[in-house]
Every structure is written in C-alpha cells, then in structure tokens.
Amino acid sequence: MQESKKPGRVSIPLSAVRRWNGGVLTSNGYVLDERRLGELVAVPEEERGDRAQLRARLQRDGYLFLAGLLDPAVVLAFREYYFGLTGPVADRASYRKVLFEEIVPGAEYAAFCAQPALKGWFEWFLGGEPFLHRRKIIRQTAPGENGIGTATQAHYDLVYLRGGSDHVLSAWIPLGDCPVSRGGLTYLEGSHHRVLEEEAAGRLKRPAASITADLPALATQYDANWLVTDYAAGDVVVHTAHTVHAALDNVSTELRLSTDIRYQRADDAIDNRWQNHWHDQDGL
C-alpha cells in the first residue's frame, strides 16, 4: 500500500488510516484530510526514566504520550465509580447535579488526580513541589453526538490560563480504553512552536476561546498533521499550554470518558481562577 505524503512531513500509511473508522475521521462533523494525519508517538521505554530527554522531547514535540503510566485497574475503578453514580439518572438535570455536586468535588476524584503514579511523576519531571489546579474537568461524549460544539474544538490551553505561569502542563487521561473511533484527543503537530513565536511577538493574544471547529482548514493553515492514536486505560498525554489540540467525534458504540487536569511547580505563578471546582457555568 502506498503511503500518502505531504511536503516535509511523513504521514502514516493509508492502511493504518483506514483501520480507524474506514479512513474517515471527523471532528464536529468536519472530515479530516487523510493526507494531513500522523500517528501520536509514545515515549520509548528507554527514555521514560531520563528527565533531560523527556524535557527535550516535550520542547520539541509539545506533548509526551506516556503509555501505561497509570495502573489500568485504578483507571477502570474510577470509571466504574463514575458510571455507578451517573448511570441511574434519567435526565440531563439530574446528571449535572450528580456530576457537579458529587463527583467533581468528591474525594474519589481528588484522590484519582493526585494518585502517586501521577503526582509523583510530575514532582520528578518538574524537579520541585507539584501543584494540582483544583479546576479539573471530566468529559463524557455519547456515541453519535456530532455537529459544531459536540467535540472539543481546536485550542491551546494558555488562553484559559493567562493568570498564571505559561509553564503549566496539562494531563489528558482517558478513563478507559479510547480507540480513535471513540473520539480521543488529537494534536496538531508542531503547533506549539508557531503559537510560542506568535505569543512572544504579541500577534496572538487570543481571548479565552477555541480557535476553530474546522480541523482540516487549521491543518492546512499550519501546514501540519493532526496526530491520532488508539489510547488504552492507563495512558496519559502531557502537553504544554501552547500545543493546539482537539477531540475527534465519537463514532463508536461506547461512551467516551476522560479527564483533563493541570499540574505545575508550586513556586511558579498560579492562576487563582482555577482554584475552584470545575463547573460548566464557571465562565472559564
């Protein structure tokens, strides 16, 4: 099978693209151009214990895909806890009450996000006391949900965190297996370099909003690939505040559940707006 190519990039083979939903990947209903797809690459095992190499990789790529960082049993236990509370609810209002009054501020969620395998990794990687922002987000996407605003649109996190350090790191954690068809996160290759340059030059002081829902057009604008992969329970992706990312549509038959949280050094500037529990009406 011949590979699809684009100048200066190496795309994944068409055979690999086609195993993901028959080669048709969408986000908010927009069909991604298979010529502008790449594979999100996990950090090799031999580099996992080398902090200098990891920092260099993060600076180069804008993300660290840490396959199997967490114990899958711990991840699946939290997933079971979540659906144990939300499963019985019959309407949207009841679901939101359970989510924002029980799960988000609950001890179980706090413990999951600060588990030793996660907090300890950030302490080691950051080289200092880690600080976990209280505003931690859980996202659920049902099969077949599509259209503008359903999947997370393309954005970079700094626009929501300008009140603190731009060295804050995000951790995206699939709460259960999340193959491409289930709507996992996708990263725009090398986008952080352009964002950093334009932010530094004062040309990109974007408001706290997404860039666009049109991922194909953004890939063309940046001359970059959208990076995708199949995630498994236990995987974590750490990315910088300047890395453009989005979510794919869930075209599977299962609910997609994930959480995204932020860690940084405790001695760096902290955005105080993120020190309350997340709510979808909190204005951030």
Q: Which residues are covered by each model-predicted region?
A:
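A short hydrophobic beta-strand segment most commonly corresponding to one strand
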Residues: 171-173, 189, 253-268
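Conserved double-stranded beta-helix
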Residues: 95-106, 118-188, 192-193
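Conserved, charge-rich beta-strand/loop surface module that forms ligand/interface-binding patches
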Residues: 270-284
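Non-heme Fe(II)/2-oxoglutarate
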Residues: 53-124, 143-146, 151, 187, ...
